[in-house]
Amino acid sequence: MKDVQNQPDNRNIYLQRVGIRNLQYPVTVMDRNNGYQDTVATINMYVDLPVNFRGTHMSRFVEVLNRYRLGIDPKIIKNMLEELRNNLNASVARVEIEFPYFILKKAPVSSIESFLKYTCRIEGQKTEKLYEFTMSVGVPIMTLCPCSKEISERGAHNQRAMAWIHIKSKKMIWFEELIDAAEQAASSPVFTILKRVDEKFVTEHAYDNPRFVEDVAREIAVRLNRDERISWYRVEVESFESIHDHSAYACVMKDKED
């Protein structure tokens, strides 16, 4: 059959990225407590396209993914990208994988168990000589305003917030380690199920640990600075303010190899 993609192209324009986007696909990811966890990811896969080819072979992206979708980790991603480069005659290959990740948590007093969802993301890019791997996690947390507590006779405004941690590391790091860093930096973690005794504990704990978004970002950064495995990070914290019509935001970035 005629291979239209391999037809020559005379426009002499190099394309930095071609591929597939927003593919919903079952994958298996590493889980610190259970070994592995099955989930459904949203996946983007790209390669570059030389000036002399009209198109890439879209079906090959999913064929390669099928061979590597079980047991996603940094080494698997590296091998997947190298196979993409070879199969598609590309100099650069990139993959972005985002998925819900569930952890079983106990309520702080009643110890009732329920799953809490975190949003995890893995990005990898490979050339002939360079391999870059970034992992990210979005952690739902609670913040209580220190200023509101200071000036109010009764209570203080509090709200849910989201902490995003993005890292590059030299050695294996679990998503759970980043989640712990975010939850420990917050006024309080959040939970899917809370009974009355748990609600009392959470609200009082948050009141005793007031945090601006700036505080949360800095507390997470302190923990990441201590971890010698991490070579680069970006921390973003967004608080969905309960008494304002806007969010509060803080961000800190550091390349520890500079």
From Swiss-Prot:
Keywords in alphabetical order: Hydrolase
Record site: May be catalytically important: 145
Pathway(s) served: Cofactor biosynthesis; 7,8-dihydroneopterin triphosphate biosynthesis; 7,8-dihydroneopterin triphosphate from GTP: step 1/1
Catalysed reactions, as listed in the record: GTP + H2O = 7,8-dihydroneopterin 3'-triphosphate + formate + H(+)
InterPro entries: GTP_cyclohydrolase_FolE2, GTP_cyclohydrolase_FolE2/MptA
Keyword Hydrolase: yes
Gene3D superfamilies: Urate Oxidase
GTP-binding keyword on record: no
Single annotated GO MF: GTP cyclohydrolase I activity
Enzyme class: hydrolase
E.C. number: 3.5.4.16
NCBIfam families registered for this protein in UniProt: PRK13674.1-1
HAMAP family named in the record: GTP_cyclohydrol_B (MF_01527_B)
Protein name according to UniProt: GTP cyclohydrolase FolE2
Organism listed in the record: Pseudothermotoga lettingae (strain ATCC BAA-301 / DSM 14385 / NBRC 107922 / TMO) (Thermotoga lettingae)
Taxonomic placement: Bacteria, Thermotogati, Thermotogota, Thermotogae, Thermotogales
Protein's gene: folE2
